[in-house]
C-alpha cells in the first residue's frame, strides 16, 4: 500500500475520533443537541465560504460565471432534494414541549452526512493526488484534513446519539462521512491518479459549497433553535467556525493553503 493512500486513510479515519467523542458519557441533553447542530452549521459555513468556494474560483481556467453558477446549482439542488424528501421541514417535526423525535434527527443526520460526504469525497482525492506529487505537502494536507474531520465526526455523532441513545448508530452515521473521503482516495489510487481535472474538481467544490450553505441555513440552524428555544444556536455556530478557522490557520502556518 502506497504512502499517499495511507495518509488519505488516516485522515478519513480521524472522523471516528470525533464520533467517539460525541458518544462518550451520558446521553446529551437538548441543549447539547442544539449546540451540536449549530456547531455543524458553523463548520459547514466556514469551510464552504472561506475555503471551498474561494479555492474553486482561484483555480486556473475557472471562470467566475462557472464557479458561481455551480455554487447556485448546489443551492438549488439542495432545495430540490429537500422538496423530494417525504417529510416536512425539520423544525416542524419537533413537537413543542417534547423531546425531539428520532425521525427528524435521523433525516437531518442523513442530509448532514450527505453534505459532509460530498465535501470529503473530493478532499480524499485531493489528499491522495497531492501526496503522490509531493509527499511533504501531502503530510501537511493530511494533518489539516484530519483536524477538519474530528469536529465533523463529533457534529454528526452528537445529534444522532442524543436522538436515538445508540452509540453504534451515531458512530455509523459519522463513519459514513469519513468513509466517503477514504473512498475518494481509493478511487484516485485505482483510477484517477494525477489525471484529475482541476476544472472539474473546482466545479464540484463550488457546487458542494452551495449544498452545504443551504443545509446549514435552512436545516441545521432552524432545527437547533426549535429544539432548544431558550438558547441561541449562534453560539454553536461561532464555536464551529472558530474550530475550523483554527485548523485553517494551522494549515497556512505550515505553508499550505
UniProtKB/Swiss-Prot annotation:
GO annotations of cellular component type: plasma membrane
Keywords, alphabetical: Cell inner membrane, Cell membrane, Ion transport, Iron, Membrane, Metal-binding, Transmembrane, Transmembrane helix, Transport, Zinc, Zinc transport
Chain sites annotated for binding Fe(2+): 120, 123, 149, 152, 181
Main location: membrane
GO terms, molecular function: metal ion binding; zinc ion transmembrane transporter activity
Pfam families referenced in this protein's UniProt entry, alphabetically: Zip
Protein's cellular compartments: Cell inner membrane
Superkingdom of this protein's organism: Bacteria
TM regions (residue ranges): 5-25, 32-52, 61-81, 182-202, 203-223, 236-256
InterPro entries: ZIP, Zn_transptr_ZupT
Residues at which Zn(2+) binds: 123, 148, 152
Topology in membrane: Multi-pass membrane protein
Catalysed transformations (reactions): Zn(2+)(in) = Zn(2+)(out)
Entry-linked HAMAP family: ZupT (MF_00548)
Task of the protein: Mediates zinc uptake. May also transport other divalent cations.
Protein family: Belongs to the ZIP transporter (TC 2.A.5) family. ZupT subfamily.
Name by which UniProt lists this protein: Zinc transporter ZupT
Amino acid at each position: 500500500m502506497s504512502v499517499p493512500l495511507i495518509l488519505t486513510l488516516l485522515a478519513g479515519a480521524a472522523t471516528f475520533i470525533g464520533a467517539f467523542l460525541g458518544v462518550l458519557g451520558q446521553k446529551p441533553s437538548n441543549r447539547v443537541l442544539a449546540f451540536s447542530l449549530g456547531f455543524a452549521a458553523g463548520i459547514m459555513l466556514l469551510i464552504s465560504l472561506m475555503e471551498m468556494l474561494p479555492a474553486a474560483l482561484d483555480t486556473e481556467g475557472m471562470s467566475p460565471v462557472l464557479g458561481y453558477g455551480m455554487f447556485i446549482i448546489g443551492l438549488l439542488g439542495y432545495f430540490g432534494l429537500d422538496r423530494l424528501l417525504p417529510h416536512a421541514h425539520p423544525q416542524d417535526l419537533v413537537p413543542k414541549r417534547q423531546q425531539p423525535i428520532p425521525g427528524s434527527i435521523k433525516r437531518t443526520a442523513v442530509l448532514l452526512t450527505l453534505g459532509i460526504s460530498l465535501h470529503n469525497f473530493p478532499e480524499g482525492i485531493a489528499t491522495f493526488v497531492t501526496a503522490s506529487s509531493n509527499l511533504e505537502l501531502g503530510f501537511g494536507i493530511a494533518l489539516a484534513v484530519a483536524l477538519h474531520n474530528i469536529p465533523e465526526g463529533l457534529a454528526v455523532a452528537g445529534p444522532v446519539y442524543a436522538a436515538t441513545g445508540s452509540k453504534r448508530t451515531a458512530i455509523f452515521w459519522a463513519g459514513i462521512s469519513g468513509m466517503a473521503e477514504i473512498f475518494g482516495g481509493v478511487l484516485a489510487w485505482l483510477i484517477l491518479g494525477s489525471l484529475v481535472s482541476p476544472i472539474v474538481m473546482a466545479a464540484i467544490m463550488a457546487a458542494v459549497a452551495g449544498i452545504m450553505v443551504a443545509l446549514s441555513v435552512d436545516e441545521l440552524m432552524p432545527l437547533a433553535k426549535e429544539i432548544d428555544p431558550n438558547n441561541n444556536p449562534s453560539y454553536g455556530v461561532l464555536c464551529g467556525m472558530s474550530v475550523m478557522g483554527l485548523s485553517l490557520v494551522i494549515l497556512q502556518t505550515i505553508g499550505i493553503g
